[in-house]
């Protein structure tokens, strides 16, 4: 397929919707970094780098200047991506998903490498020809009249960067909104507020279309601060200090509230596999692909590259100059499924660790639990009895972090009764729930952590069954009616977080047990609504999943029937 068949903006909109759970509000952080740069950055060095980047040919000393300035910027910023190489294997993603990801990364690698070998002006493809061959080809092109003498620099023969180690160029380009805004303010002689207002309007336009140079010209009449943006088409590997339209659009995307802008995505190790899994789902739904044609990356290629560069940070807008390697270097797909040997039980004193989870999954659970903030209010709820729970959720309203998982019940008859009168979960939807997750989470909880619950008895029993008498519980003791004041609003706003409550819930015929609602009870959304009752309102902020969604269920074919 060719780039001409790519419906770019439709793909962008689909990616925004599909990855919306990981988009964040970054305006305050971006402006904090902007102020830090305005206070601490030497803009004489910035101007020097900008002049250098306008030259046709650059050498090692120029690269040193660019890298030194990038280091200075990185040291002043809070928003920066850290080197976090990711290793994906069967279990975190299915084998088919891993193969698809590996294939796309390889295609993207080939495309990027081809793009870097394409001539700067006439688009002549260099392939894997040596410099001697390229020079000779230029002479032949001149001989046959295709290329005029003296135009070698635009014919793709003379390199733009004449340096000893090309690998030092990696990750030294790409715009950073805080840098763009600070340069527009300082070098344009504008107030920070005027620059922010202009870029915000540009960002709002970006929610509906890709802004072009005509749009920029129109907006400039209202916002003179945008005059400093260069009236040039986007180029590959242009310096982040170049005030291009694409850099300004990226900055604008960070300054609007809403829109689920891809530029505001934040990645953490605990969410990485979930984001990749969701990306592949969106890709297949929209029939996206990696194009072999050299040139600018299409929306799918762009988000794939940025996500796979590092598993920690803001892929689009953070300072990334200190990351080594490229996306295909830093995200490694492993197909080796060799089993890890179980530890030998201790003979005298101490029992072997009994767990149904593989060590790598156990470690992922621990990292997810460690991401919780121990001093924040922490709601906890379960569905099902404490000795046979089918759903478990922890929710922290201040940070909007949550851990949520399911479990296949042992007592099927009792489960079906509870489904009918309470939680509405169907057996088929939890048939392949990964066993051992709830126990692993409880084992990993910090010592003496305090939880808040609506009804503490079942939670206390669950903790005690796991030997966690140290964990403390505060029971808010709301009435059934009080606890569900915000039920409809919570379900309307956050029902996408929980899709396993598909059954019909009916009122119990047992005397005195009529529920206050016939809506299904969800452990996660119950925690959200209980918290809303105490605070007096439902948050607009999207809760952030800490336990990767791909851990919740095992592949159906791996289910063992005894």
Curated annotation (Swiss-Prot):
Keyword vocabulary terms for this entry: Capsid protein, Helical capsid protein, Host cytoplasm, Host-virus interaction, Hydrolase, Inhibition of host IKBKE by virus, Inhibition of host innate immune response by virus, Inhibition of host RLR pathway by virus, Interferon antiviral system evasion, Manganese, Metal-binding, Ribonucleoprotein, RNA-binding, Viral immunoevasion, Viral nucleoprotein, Virion, Zinc
EC code(s) of this entry: 3.1.13.-
Residues that hold Mn(2+) according to the record: 381, 383, 526
Gene3D superfamilies: Arenaviral nucleoprotein, C-terminal domain (3.30.420.410), Arenavirus nucleocapsid protein, head domain (1.10.150.550)
UniProt-listed InterPro entries: Nucleocapsid_arenaviridae, Nucleocapsid_C_arenaviridae, Nucleocapsid_C_sf, Nucleocapsid_N_arenaviridae
Keyword Metal-binding: yes
Single GO term (MF): RNA binding
A GO biological-process term: symbiont-mediated suppression of host cytoplasmic pattern recognition receptor signaling pathway via inhibition of IKBKE activity
Stretch list, region Binding site for the cap structure m7GTP: 53-238
Keyword rRNA processing: no
GO cellular component, one term: viral nucleocapsid
Top enzyme class: hydrolase
Binding positions (Zn(2+)): 391, 498, 501, 522
Superkingdom field: Viruses
Main location, first listed in the record: virion
Pfam family, one: Arena_ncap_C
Chain's role: Encapsidates the genome, protecting it from nucleases. The encapsidated genomic RNA is termed the nucleocapsid (NC). Serves as template for viral transcription and replication. The increased presence of protein N in host cell does not seem to trigger the switch from transcription to replication as observed in other negative strain RNA viruses.
Assembly, per entry: Homomultimerizes to form the nucleocapsid. Binds to viral genomic RNA. Interacts with glycoprotein G2. Interacts with protein Z; this interaction probably directs the encapsidated genome to budding sites. Interacts with protein L; this interaction does not interfere with Z-L interaction. Interacts with host IKBKE (via Protein kinase domain); the interaction inhibits IKBKE kinase activity.
Similarity comment text for this entry: Belongs to the arenaviridae nucleocapsid protein family.
Domain notes: The N-terminal region is important for the cap-binding activity while the C-terminal region contains the 3'-5' exoribonuclease activity. A CCHE zinc binding site is present in the C-terminal region and may thus contribute to the substrate binding and/or the specificity of the exonuclease activity.
Protein name per Swiss-Prot or TrEMBL: Nucleoprotein
Protein source organism: Whitewater Arroyo mammarenavirus (isolate Rat/United States/AV 9310135/1995) (WWAV)
Lineage start: Viruses, Riboviria, Orthornavirae, Negarnaviricota, Polyploviricotina
